[in-house]
Regions:
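A compositional/biophysical signature of low hydrophobicity enriched in polar/charged and small residues
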Residues: 1-144
Length: 144
């Protein structure tokens, strides 16, 4: 792994559909060299896939929030499975992380309006091991 590999990774992370030709122009390498490096990164499991970036606002999900949870459990797998299986109309759980610090779990959610957050709050408080929650609206993002 060298600095060129890292530049390839950063470009692909930002633009999953970038062509090898465009990468070769940006990095001043031949297309075969780019192809060989990308193939090697894929074979090593460093690049594991390519994904679409969704503009959630075009789907009507204009509100984005971070929900912090403090829980009382040692069975995080069971709790995460329950969170994964939550079905709430007009809500997308985009990310869910077990973290250290004051809170135990952080979730990034999207819905059409701030009032839509009430539905997930109501459902979360039905889960007995959730002790406390806090919701923060995301006003803007530097990186996404």
């Amino acid at each position: 792994m060298d600095s060129l590999d890292m530049q390839i990774i950063k470009n692909i992370e930002k633009e999953g559909r970038i062509s090898h030709e465009e990468l070769s122009k940006r990095l001043n390498l031949s297309r075969p060299a780019i192809h060989n490096r990308v193939t090697k990164l894929e074979e090593q499991g460093i690049i594991t896939g390519y994904k679409a970036t969704i503009d959630w606002s075009k789907l009507g999900f204009n509100t984005c929030a971070i929900i912090s949870l403090r829980v009382r459990t040692t069975d995080y797998d069971n709790l995460l499975e329950r969170l994964k299986n939550l079905i709430i109309p007009d809500l997308v759980i985009e990310e869910c992380h077990i973290v250290t610090g004051t809170w135990c779990i952080l979730m990034k959610v999207r819905c059409s309006t701030p009032l839509g957050l009430k539905a997930i709050q109501d459902d979360l408080h039905k889960i007995e091991c959730i002790k406390e929650s806090s919701t923060s609206l995301i006003l803007s993002s530097l990186y996404d």
